Amino acid sequence: MIERGKFRSLTLINWNGFFARTFDLDELVTTLSGGNGAGKSTTMAAFVTALIPDLTLLHFRNTTEAGATSGSRDKGLHGKLKAGVCYSMLDTINSRHQRVVVGVRLQQVAGRDRKVDIKPFAIQGLPMSVQPTQLVTETLNERQARVLSLAELKDKLDEMEGVQFKQFNSITDYHSLMFDLGIIARRLRSASDRSKFYRLIEASLYGGISSAITRSLRDYLLPENSGVRKAFQDMEAALRENRLTLEAIRVTQSDRDLFKHLISEATDYVAADYMRHTNERRVHLDQALAFRRELYTSRKQLAAEQYKHVDMARELGEHNGAEGSLEADYQAASDHLNLVQTALRQQEKIERYEADLEELQIRLEEQNEVVAEAAEMQDENEARAEAAELEVDELKSQLADYQQALDVQQTRAIQYNQAISALARAKELCHLPDLTPESAAEWLDTFQAKEQEATEKLLSLEQKMSVAQTAHSQFEQAYQLVAAINGPLARSEAWDVARELLRDGVNQRHLAEQVQPLRMRLSELEQRLREQQEAERLLAEFCKRQGKNFDIDELEALHQELEARIASLSESVSSASEQRMALRQEQEQLQSRIQHLMQRAPVWLAAQNSLNQLSEQCGEEFTSSQEVTEYLQQLLEREREAIVERDEVGARKNAVDEEIERLSQPGGAEDQRLNALAERFGGVLLSEIYDDVSLEDAPYFSALYGPSRHAIVVPDLSQIAEQLEGLTDCPEDLYLIEGDPQSFDDSVFSVDELEKAVVVKIADRQWRYSRFPSLPIFGRAARENRIESLHAEREVLSERFATLSFDVQKTQRLHQAFSRFIGSHLSVAFEDDPEAEIRRLNGRRVELERALATHESDNQQQRLQFEQAKEGVSALNRLLPRLNLLADETLADRVDEIQERLDEAQEAARFVQQYGNQLAKLEPVVSVLQSDPEQFEQLKEDYAWSQQMQRDARQQAFALAEVVERRAHFSYSDSAEMLSGNSDLNEKLRQRLEQAEAERTRAREALRSHAAQLSQYSQVLASLKSSYDTKKELLNDLQRELQDIGVRADSGAEERARQRRDELHAQLSNNRSRRNQLEKALTFCEAEMENLTRKLRKLERDYHEMREQVVTAKAGWCAVMRMVKDNGVERRLHRRELAYLSADELRSMSDKALGALRLAVADNEHLRDVLRLSEDPKRPERKIQFFVAVYQHLRERIRQDIIRTDDPVEAIEQMEIELSRLTEELTSREQKLAISSRSVANIIRKTIQREQNRIRMLNQGLQSVSFGQVNSVRLNVNVRETHATLLDVLSEQQEQHQDLFNSNRLTFSEALAKLYQRLNPQIDMGQRTPQTIGEELLDYRNYLEMEVEVNRGSDGWLRAESGALSTGEAIGTGMSILVMVVQSWEDEARRLRGKDISPCRLLFLDEAARLDARSIATLFELCERLQMQLIIAAPENISPEKGTTYKLVRKVFQNTEHVHVVGLRGFAPQLPGTQTEDTPSEAS
């Protein structure tokens, strides 16, 4: 028999009035007696505080501050403590004889709220000899001791071997230890459980019928059917979870589309941008490299252009200089040609003028002769006319004078004066100052003789003049010719000069005859000289172009070498063309192949992605299509095997589910029909009677009853005999046992127990041997154990089934994936890697481009060499025929020599041309020059002088004649003499005047006619002279101009000058064309250089910008790559097939995905913000952050109970696999989990019946309890009418309400609540939810109404109420109920802890004086029968004959208050180990 645990003692340390007091507790009743304020309530408060250290519950109302409502106010504990560390400890010993000390350390907290700090602790393994006060106090001297702190207590206990000290931070842990060690009767899991326990202690402490306990008797007495309730809750939770999971599946199915859409669009959005940046980075790198290559190429090209520019500029300078000289030469040649042409024209004019002059000269000579003759005749006529005129004038004068003298006397003076004038004139003319009128006559004769002599001399001279004039004209003509040829010279030198001129003329004519041959020779030599100069120029240019000076002898060898080089270069160029064509053809083929591979690469990459996914899914590596098809066959075989194994596991799981369902039947009935038969027969299933059998006893009772363990126990078999007739709806074997279901035992069989077996003697001649089953299922504990093992097996099977189903689904998905792969990608998946081929071909293309560039460079050099060789050969072809010219070093000297000879010949020709006619004229008359006819001039002078002398003589004679004639006038003596003497003279004068006038008229006519003729002759002569002089002057001018021109105007000069001009013009044109070409080339070169310079600057800028962009992008890209790798999304984003799309296509793809994403994340603020931030094109890492955020968001939305991965992409794949399987499995589970309303009603009814039976058994123990007029106490349990109606409807009319129970939107609890509301519309449910109401309706305790009844006096059974009972009756009744509650708790907790522990039972009763002696005795009897300890507080001693009584007296000693305690043990026999402490404790 298991001994019940007991409280041994209560120790108070440093409490008010108790410094170190230990109260030994009696095994039954401990009485605390004393007056008011003695410390009874303090002692009980210390006990309750150690038992329930919860300040939220502790409330000692007899000392609590009146009217206080604040939770922070003192609840009566603060005033019971003294300052410092306080302890309250309970010393217990449990059923296992283990000493356990539990207690609390209390300490007042400073402040006006009067709070108390409580620390619970426990001590195990303490020796029995150690008293609790020794643990927590330290003796200082005989009268002083010190209280240890909790830390000191722990250190002290740590030093004691085998002693364990535990300090608790949680009251739940403290109570859990006390429950496990059997100190308290119930496991206090929560504050609600602690509150119930405290209310029970409080009710027992203050006595009476507690309204709180009465109202909640169901919670105290009716055990919570945790198994059934947990089963309902688990079922509902499973159903709820199942439905939530199904809903989650449906959500997940929608999420799958969302996942697909979001992942697809996010992947397109980010991967397109990622690959675009990757492509752009590669493009930028390629562009940077291309820029750098182009930069270097441009620099080289610019340097080449600069060198070329320098060469062309130098050549252009040379051509400009040459052009200046050529222009000067050409202009000189043109001018020379013009001069030659002018000279020729001048020469023609000169010749023409010379011919004209010769003709004019002849005419002039003839006209001179005519004019001279006419002049002579004119002179004669003038003289004759003058003489006649003079004579007429004289005669008229004389006649006038005479007439005047005759007419007027005064004329005499006039005549005298005239005579004087005539004398004076005669003196003057005759140079005779002494002339007198008288000598005038003499002198007249003299002078007339002189006149006659002069006339004769003049006539002789005229004759001489006519003779000498011919010789003189020839000499003058010859002299003029010599003078014209030689220039002015002395007349005496004319002969010698003329002879020299004639000899020189012969030489000059000989030289002049050589002009044309010399000119032709000179022209030929000049042509050769020009060709030599041209050859030298060509040689210089050739050497300059060849960059080397060559000798003339080397040119032929060089020509042959160049010819050979041209042949080899021509072959090289032709072969290079073929090679270039072959390279370009290969390059085009490579480009075409690369294009084809680039088109095939995305398809191949898609196939590789699919193949890699297949390889990852199946863990195999495939190298050929045959392996894929073989693995597909293996996959089909594996799928068949997995399906077979899954079906087997499913069948076993269904069997386990059926067994679990069978074992889960209420009452242990494996057949539902047994419950119906038991209810029909009014019996109870045997399994239900033995439902509480322990797990250890289950094999025994299972073997004991054998097949009849499913029997129905009925009160009377005879009453059901009639009901057995016609019974068909029952098991094949139905066992019926007669007996009282309330007090049934196993005495119906005679049993012999063997080792692990029993022998049941059914009759004298029938025994049954039954071994203990290895897996008993008799009794709830055995069934629960079996169900637990079955659940474990079911979990394993479910997991295995889920795994197999997953594998089957996965295999099927894999099979479908393989089928799709075979249909779509098998033809290309195992082809060679196009990207590797592209890389190889790109390498080859780069080699070809490099080879082409090298070939082009070589070919260009060869072409340049070929062109140079051709130019060299062309130049040599022009040079080689002129080698003899180049070798002729005397050509220039010969040209100079011929030029000099030609100059001499031309000079001679000009001399002959100029003076040839004069020499021809001179040659026949040159002999006249031998003698100079100098007398001709003298004759002319003599003739003129004689003519003048004749004229003078004639004038003198006339003057003298006039004087002589006027001699009379000198002596007028009288006028008569003068008149008479002059009348004859007058007549003579008149006659003479007439003759003279006639002579004068004749002379005038002759003079006039000769004058007109002479004038005509003179005019002709003048015109001839003028024409001659003009032409002579023009000829002289032309000759001077011709001399000024300084050119030789021969017949070939113009042709040579024109040819020279044309040659120079051709050279100038060639030079200009070359210069223009060079200028254009130079301009083009400068433009090219400028373009190259601009291009170079742009390239440098672009290169630096691109390089900076590449470097900047590299840093950003490194961050992007780091973020990609850190988050493991590189495989998702680096989609190689996108590398073959253009930037516009990728940007379009990203923009489309962005538009879709904006709609997809419109309801998600976080993703929307991240997406908005990711739209910044300058921050590509934000797109990665968005992608990671999407993945994180999707990871958070992955149902881990459905999908076992964190990768949303894999989650989609698993969704596809899991969803259909989970949907099917969960649907079937829901069908299996779904319980019928009839089953629920039966379970609740059976539970109610069982608890009613248990309450009846508890009532049997209360039947003998009596207090005062109360003869008996009982509990009455009834089913509420509303709930009974609910059970009836659930059992019999559930079909009418299937709309509630078949709804997938309602749980069973909610459907039950809806049904309850439907059945009881008058009841107000308040704010409670249907789920809460349904859970309450699933608790059978809510179906019961429980009340306490007492049998009091003559009133019979009455409801126990405080107003109907006396105080003592109420206290006794309440104590009885509390004892029943404690017993009920123990029965309920027996299954929760070891069977070898019987917990302590202890109750309190304060103010027990209100009970009479009979009631006290009843309490003592109740405590003894129930092995319960009781602590009573009363002012007086109560039953000192039993139990232990402590007398408490509060005293003041030396201003120190303490409680004096005296213990008295009762008269009853003492239990061993009980001691009474008589020495009071004093507070130090």
Curated annotation (Swiss-Prot):
Region described as Flexible hinge: spans on this chain: 666-783
Keyword list, A-Z: ATP-binding, Cell cycle, Cell division, Chromosome partition, Coiled coil, Cytoplasm, DNA condensation, DNA-binding, Nucleotide-binding
GO cellular component entries: cytoplasm; nucleoid
Superkingdom as given in the UniProt entry: Bacteria
Keyword check for DNA-binding: yes
Location of this chain's protein in the cell: Cytoplasm, Nucleoid
UniProt binding sites for ATP: 34-41
GO molecular function, one term: ATP binding
Principal subcellular localisation of the protein: cytoplasm
Coiled coil: 326-418, 444-472, 509-602, 835-923, 977-1116, 1209-1265
Basic and acidic residues: compositionally biased ranges: 1051-1065
Gene Ontology biological-process annotations: cell division; chromosome condensation; chromosome segregation; DNA replication
Signal peptide feature range: none
Pfam families, A to Z: MukB, MukB_hinge, SbcC_Walker_B
Family (UniProt): Belongs to the SMC family. MukB subfamily.
Function: Plays a central role in chromosome condensation, segregation and cell cycle progression. Functions as a homodimer, which is essential for chromosome partition. Involved in negative DNA supercoiling in vivo, and by this means organize and compact chromosomes. May achieve or facilitate chromosome segregation by condensation DNA from both sides of a centrally located replisome during cell division.
Domain comment quoted from the record: The hinge domain, which separates the large intramolecular coiled coil regions, allows the homodimerization, forming a V-shaped homodimer.
Complex and partners: Homodimerization via its hinge domain. Binds to DNA via its C-terminal region. Interacts, and probably forms a ternary complex, with MukE and MukF via its C-terminal region. The complex formation is stimulated by calcium or magnesium. Interacts with tubulin-related protein FtsZ.
Name listed for the protein in its UniProt record: Chromosome partition protein MukB
Organism whose genome encodes this protein: Salmonella dublin (strain CT_02021853)
Name of the coding gene: mukB
